[in-house]
Structures are given as structure tokens and as C-alpha cells.
Amino acid sequence: MDAKDEKRFNLALQINNFKASLVEFNKLVEQTTAQKKEERAGIFIPKEDSIDYDKFYTSVQQIFGPEVKNQDVKCFYRKLCNNPDAAFDWCEIFGYFSTDEDSLTSQMDEENLVFLVSRKQRIVIAGSRRRDVIKCIVKVPQLDLLITASQKGLITVFNSQDTSWITGCDYLGQLKRIVATTERTIIVWDYKAQGSSQEHYFVIKPMDHCLLCVCVVPLPDQLCRDDILLGDDGGFVNKFTVSSDDFGLKQAKTKKKLQTQVLDSKNFKSVKRKLHNDWVMKIRYIPALNCFGSCSLDSVHSLVLESLKRLEDNLPVREFAMPRGANSFCYCGKANVIVTGGDDKVLRLWHPNISTKPVGKLVGHMFSITEIVSNEKEQHVISLSSAKVFRVWDIQTLSVLQVFHDSQGGPGDMQIYSMVYDANHGMLITGSGVIDMYPLTRMIQDTKQVPHTHEREVNVTLYNKYFHQVLTVCSESVIKVWELETGLQIYQILDPHGLSIELTCAAIDESGYLFATGAYNGTVKIWDFGSGQEMKMMPEGKDWVEEEHGLMRLFFLKPQVKQQHLILALERNGTIKIIQGKEDDIFLTVIWELPDAMPYLQYGSHIVHLKMSTKERTMAIPFPDVELIVQKTSQQTNYSPIVDVDVNCIDVFQTEGYNLIACGTTNGMIILWNFIAASVKEIYRPEDCFSTDPELDPKRFRINDIMFLFRSPECVRRSSQDSICSSTQCDSSKGPQSSKGSKQSIHDADVKGEHTDMVGEQQSASRKQPVPISFVEPQPPLLVSAHEDGHLRLWTLEGKLIKDMLPFTKHSAISLTSLYTDSCCRVLLAGNVEGHVILCSISSFMDPPHDEKKFKQLLSWRAHSLEIIQVIYVEEKQLVLTASIDGSVRIWNSTSGHYCGYFGQRRMFDLSQTSDFILPCDVNEYPIEIKEESKFTEKTQKYEYPLIFDRERWKKMSSMSLLFKRPPLSPFEVQHDFKFFKSLSSPKIRRYALEGFLTENREAGIVFGSLPIYRVPSPTSLRFLPLIGSEVQRDSVEGVYMKKKHDKVKREEAPEMTEGSRRKSLKRNLVPQINLASSFFPTTPK
């Protein structure tokens, strides 16, 4: 079998394999479509048999390989779920959709990276000739060099670390030289040479045509050899191969070199081929495509994209045609497109393998496009026109992000001839008569406009974990659905409940296919999540009072019968009811209502028993019909009807052995409805919650949110090392902002040792007591409540307070508004009215006996400048979603508090934690990481300010007038208040030098000869230095004098005692003493 037959055989085999893959893919689509139809019909499908997105994506990868893009498969899966009856084409799985809709169209994004024009830097090249202009700029990212070449022959190399300038135009990576071109010559120059050798360079000539552009082909596998591509005015592309032997770079250093050496171009290995019918304006080598590109003003052969081998033969090449040719082009690797621009003022986007038609166009320039560069990291394309107008484009959304103009200089003198983007420093560099540098910055940092997802304040935010999408509702009654990973808007619904009817709450069912909305007028609607179509509704009652039946909370309940929907609703008046939706009825009806127990609990009854109704229902519901069993009590407290006692928040908990509803009221009470124990009881009641005080805030006791915390047996079996909290403690110090000081640490002590010991104890305990999987018993649930006074409290079902915490933020005692936890209760999130997010670790705390020391706050950060109404934790992505009344829904990294963006921005999300730490424009506080001090850490006292002996203070303390003021001490009692230590003080900085009378002693030698000798004044006479215990003698003398009143001796006469009598009295009261004067003042020779 020859090569041609083998090639045909391999091609036929690949076609057969692809056809077999298509058959398997069609079977997968048929199976998934049939299952989605059954789910829409209400047929129960076991979880292990259900085909969710993860299973579907894994199956597609097994069929077609790992090259299938995640985003394309997700779009195909979403289309399949929204309309299983629609027709599907296999090419859609590869991203080729036939729709004309542009889902990327949205408003301008203030978070995008743009160029900060106001901080433009300008470098004037010293020594440049008059009216000289920079014709070429090349960036060498490996060495962080910037190379420029002027029209009149000045070549300059700029180094970010060195201000000295060296000359050059493009860089030969293997030879470590700079190559430049003139009209008829090639110049190779050693920019690292020193002294007179710096002017040594090689000239290669002659050339057949005028050289217009040059680039170097990187050859990492070749040593001491480089390939140079040249474009000329004849439409030829030349390739020159240069090596170290060609320039004699290996010769001995003793050999004298001339300053300029002329080399014959015929001695170099070179090939050329005519690819254009006009000037070659730009030539570049693209390593990602392993080919070179050259553009020309030729309208037929405008752009040629081919491998280097095509220069050596006459085989056809890939040609891209465009009117009036192309002046410049660039390649974007992530988007895999080539962008061209020329005199027709249109930027065209081309797929490298499709030369017949561009895949997109960018229109906006009013003059000819002269330069194009790309910002690969941010997916930006920067284009420059002949009028010095810059436009920054988003290559993903095909939209313009920024337009700015270089207004300095005249149109001729200051024309910009070259432009390059420095990815190392995030800077756009242009060359004209000067070099201008535009630093890249976040647009959100350079604007005063706050990010907004909706035009009005956000009322509801929900996360659909099955579709990985986010639903947001604003007070203007606009529903929007967003893609979590990209931030793109999927669809929106305007006025879902009618014109000017505000939506106040919403909920998503367990399967993720439906969501319900509730309005302030009491109406409820059920929608299809995938398509946004209305399915069922409950109209407003005729006798309803305005806003009395407004809905505050909605919960989907597990239906007892298939093909029906049950919704638990909380009204503004405190009523809790169940709304039912049947398959054959488009209207929703109220089938169950909970009686009001507040009138009985407020009179001191801590528990009210329930009577289950014996009435049988045609359709079973999760909660039975109940009646309150009222018992008359003799003790009744005075109840003020002015106090608001309505239910403000509720939560539902239904699992095996539990059927509970927890309620938090506006006056601070927590009520628990237990339908298994047939009782409703008071969990918590603040003191004076029923009394009114006009000087106090009536909302001070209000409970803003309440939630059950329960860890299922499956979660108990999981390892605690998978917890997000442990990863936060371990990885938070590795965050980029920690090294830059963007975080504020409360305690510097390391908790690694304590954490390791705790994990080790858990592992050793698990080894000693192996528990079978089937015998793991779940612990009873806990209650957590968020209070108006800023406290976070945790309760048992019996009403025992096990944790009362005031979260640490910049300002304490801030009202908490929202709570959220993950599926296994490892992390607890809370939001407050000042826009802070509090992240707590509760993984160890949930294990009995619920040690409150294991409840730890890990992180807090300012997410909004206004109140947070909802905080959501996406555990599979370790992200936090926050919604605020400022109209924005923002996304954060949970492990570090890094800001990722907001829904509604023009650019897609980059959820990977980068080193660029940014904040929204309305937030200027860095995240605060909370670290506990380890109990194993020894506290060592540090003395930062040493004390010195203050002679002036000693003189005051040693005066004789202070010797007779204190009462005497008992014998053998030691006086600890030493005056010497009282004479110590902090060092004072002298504003004048000490007096020196001798600056040098020649006889002492040169080592210490320059040390000055200072005069030290003589110490105070030792005669009056006090002794330890002298306080006793001084006070004893005073006692002797007071006894001589019968002799009528005045106190003024006491100093007239003789010296002998004074010494005798001192000897009589002598106690053990120590003379410290010799220690403090050594004797000085006279």
C-alpha cells in the first residue's frame, strides 16, 4: 500500500468513526429528550437515572472527545430542556447554531479594563533629529525590552529597569542581537556591547527591493540561528537565515573588529516569494498557528496566512481578500480569530481556516485604520486610525468599550506610526515624535457610576443549581435570568404580574424546571424556568384589602401526588397558607391555612397544643389540618395592641421524623410549629417585647431571617477536609492580596497547628470507632436567626441558646438581613444593612455537643454600599452572590472576598482568582480575615520603648522635703515602691549635641581615634541618697513629734533638733536595708 492509498484509508476510517459517533450522539439525544418529556409530565425519575448536565457533558466528551467546548454543550442542553420537541442538528454541539439572535447585546460595562487616558506618559527621545518620527515599535516580552526605530535611522532600546538607552528594532532571540532594516540593507547590532564596541554592527546588503517591515521567527529548538522575515515594496516576502558563524561571533576577542562590517546578502541562505501585488505593509509570525502572516494594500491578496514552507515552492496559499487591502492585522489566540483593518475603515474578524468570508465586522472608525494590537488576557482589540483615534473592542461581544483621541501635536508632525501592547505591564505604547504610554485600568475604578443589574432595587435573587443560572427580580417587576459562569443574560420578562405590580418574592422548585413568583397584591404565578413561559396563576381576590395579602416568602413543597404543585406562602399580615396547582387547571387555589397562635402565646403560654383534624382530603398535603387547643391561664400579661407581632420570616423543614415550620416575628419572638408533636411553642421571647417605649426603636427586636441547619447522614459521612471553611483557612494566606496588604488581619497568630490537631483527633477517633454507613444517625436540626440588633443566634428545637454571636465588621451591631448555608451546613453566610458579608465556619460546630468555640467567623468584606437583601453561596464554584437595594447583583470569591463582577456587565466573567485585586467603585474597604490565636502560642511581651534614668526626676524624688509624708511600715515589711524605678522615663531626643572636649587621641591608634570623648557631670552627692526602708524611719520621726503635744512644741520647731538626736531616733526604728547607690552610681576617681 503506497502513501496515497494509506492516506485515503485513514480518511475513510476517520469518516466511519465519526459516523458511528453521530449514531451514539443521536441515541443520547433521544434518551435525554424522552426523559425531559417525562419530567415535564410529572413522572418521577430516580436521581441515579436522571440525566443532568454533568452526565450529559461527560457522555458527549466520551463520544466526540475532550475538544468539545463546555459552553457549546451547555447551550445545546439548555435548548433540549426548554423544548424537547424541537428539531436538533448535530453541528450545534460544536457551536454552529443557526439562530440570528445576539444574546450578548447588553449595556456598557463599567468594570471592563480600559486605558486610563488621563495618566498617559510621554517619553521624548533625547538626541533625535528634528521632525524625526518613530516608524516601528517592537516589544520583547522575554527580556522586557521595548525597541523603536525612527525614520531617520535612530534605533532605541528601552529597558524598564535601566534608564540608559540602547539602539534596536526587532530582537534575534538566539543570537541575542537586534535586527533593523533600512531601504536597502539589514543591520544586525549587539546592543549589549560596552565602550567603543557599542558602535559595532553588521550591514547586510544589497537588497533587490525596498524593505518595509521585518519580524523574527522564534526558533527555540535551534541554537545560534535565527530566521528573519522581510516584506518589501514589490510584494515579496523574504526569509533570511542568520547564524553566529555568519557574523564571526565566535572569533577570538583579541582580534580587532571594525566598527561597521558590510556583509554580502548573497552569502546568506535566503528564499523569497511574491505573495502580493502591492507593498507589504506588515509581516508577523504567529507561533500558535505555526505560520506567518503578511498584509498588503492589494485588494485581492490582502492577507496571506501560510507556513514557512510555502515560501520555498509555488503551491497555493491561503489568501484573504478585502476592499482596498489591509494596513495591519493581529491574531487573538483565545478567540482564534485574525483581525484586519485598512483604508476601508472596517475591522474584519477571520477564522484562520476560513478565507472566503469574515466571521464578524467591527464598524466605527471614520478614517483609515493604521495599526491593530490585541490584549490577549482581557480579550481586547485596540485599533488606531490615521486621525489618532483609538478604539478598544471586546472580541467576545464585538462591542466597543472605549474611544479616546490623542490630541497633542499637529496632524503631520505627530502622526502615530507604530503601536504595541505591553502585556507584562498592562500598557499601550505608541510611537510618533514621542513615545506615549497608556496604562490599563479597570473602568470601574475610573468612573463614578455604580454597577447595576436592574434599573431599580433588587427584591429577589435565586440560584438554580441544576441549570447553573441566576434569577433576579427588581421592584420595577422585571425578571432576568443569567448564566452563572459567563454572566450573560438568557432572557427577561417584563411586567410578569401586570403593569406596575411589584414582585416581592420567588422560589425555585427542587427539580429546577419551575419557579414561582409572588406580588404585593397577593397574586402568584408559576413559570417554566427554561423558557420563561407562564404556566399557572392565582388571581387577586375581590374582597382583598390592598397590600394586606402581599406575599413575603414562597417555598415549593414536595407534592404527595404526582402532577401537582404545592407552594407554602407567607403573607404580609402573617398568614401562612398552602397554594395548590393541578395539572389540568391553569388557576392556583388556596387549600390550607395555618391558624394564628400569637394571641395565645403573648399571654404567657409558652406552648399551645394542636388538634389534628379528622377530615379526609381528596388529595394529600404535607401538613395536616390543625386546630389550637386553648387553655385558660390565670396569669395574663398586659398586651399593648400597638406592638406589631406579625410574622416577618419563616422556614420549612421536612424530612423523616420532622415536619416543622419556624417563624420569626417583628417583635423578636421565635415560634416553632411541630406537626409531629402536635404543638406550637415559643422558642425565644425578648424581655419587654410587648411593651412600648417612644424613645426606643420599635423594630429593635425584629427577626429579619430564620433558617434550619441540618446535616444529612450523607453529609456526615463526608470528610471534613472537603469543607470550604478549612480551605479558606489554609488558602487565604496564599491569596494575592495577602502579600500586598489588601487584607486586614485581626490576629496574627497562626491557627494551623490547632487545625491540624483537630483534624488529627477526628481521624484518630474515626479509626477507633468505625461507624457503619447504614447506622449513621442524623442529629436533630438547629435554628439560626438573624436579628435587628446585629446578633446571630443559634438555638436547639427545645429553645436552648447555644451560640450568641456579634459578627465582626468595621462597625459593630449592624442589623443582619439575610442568611444562607450550603447543603452540608459547613459554612454560614450572613448579610447586613451596610452591605457587609460575613462568612462563618460551622462544620465542627454542627457536631454534638455544639461547642460554641468551634463556631468561627473566617472572613468579612464590604460587598455593597447599601443594604444586602439576599446572599447566596454556590458551593461547587466557591462563589458568593450578593443582591442589594442598589440595583446590582454581584459575584465574589468566597475564599478571599475577591470581586469577580456583576450581572449585567458587558464582559463575560473570569471566575478564576487572579492577582488583580479590584473593588467596585462604591466600596473602598478591603476584606477582613479573622484569625484566632492558637492556645499553643506562647505570648511573649515585647518592650518597644526602653526606659532610661532621668536625673532631674531623681533630684525631685530625693529632696529632704519628701522624707516625712508616709505612714511607717511594720517591721520586716519590704517597700516595693523604689524611687529609682520612679525616676525612669522614656528617652528624649536632644536637639543639641553633647559637649565634647576631645575628638581624637593619636596615641590610642586609628581604630578608636575618631570616637569623641564626652564630659559626664558628677552625680548627686551620696549623702542624701535614700536607703531602702528609710520611709519607715522618716514616718517614725513624725510619730515621735506628734506625741510631744503636751510640751506645746509646734511643728515649725521640729527642724531645730540636733543632729545627734536625729541619729538616735533613726537607730531605734532601724529595719533591714540595702544601699543601692553604689550600684547605680559607681565611684569616679577625682
UniProtKB/Swiss-Prot annotation:
WD repeat feature ranges: 129-168, 170-199, 321-360, 364-403, 411-448, 453-492, 498-537, 560-602, 642-683, 765-806, 809-850, 863-902
A Pfam family annotated for this UniProt entry: WD40
Basic and acidic residues composition-biased segments: 1049-1062
This protein's name: WD repeat-containing protein 64
PROSITE patterns, A to Z: WD_REPEATS_1, WD_REPEATS_2, WD_REPEATS_REGION
InterPro entries: WD-EF-hand_domain, WD40/YVTN_repeat-like_dom_sf, WD40_repeat_dom_sf, WD40_rpt
SMART domains: WD40
Keyword Repeat (UniProt): yes
Superkingdom of this protein's organism: Eukaryota
Segments for region (Disordered): 724-749, 1047-1069
Disulphide bridges, residue numbers: none
UniProt keyword annotations, A-Z: Repeat, WD repeat
Record bears the keyword Repeat: yes
Low complexity composition-biased segments: 732-744
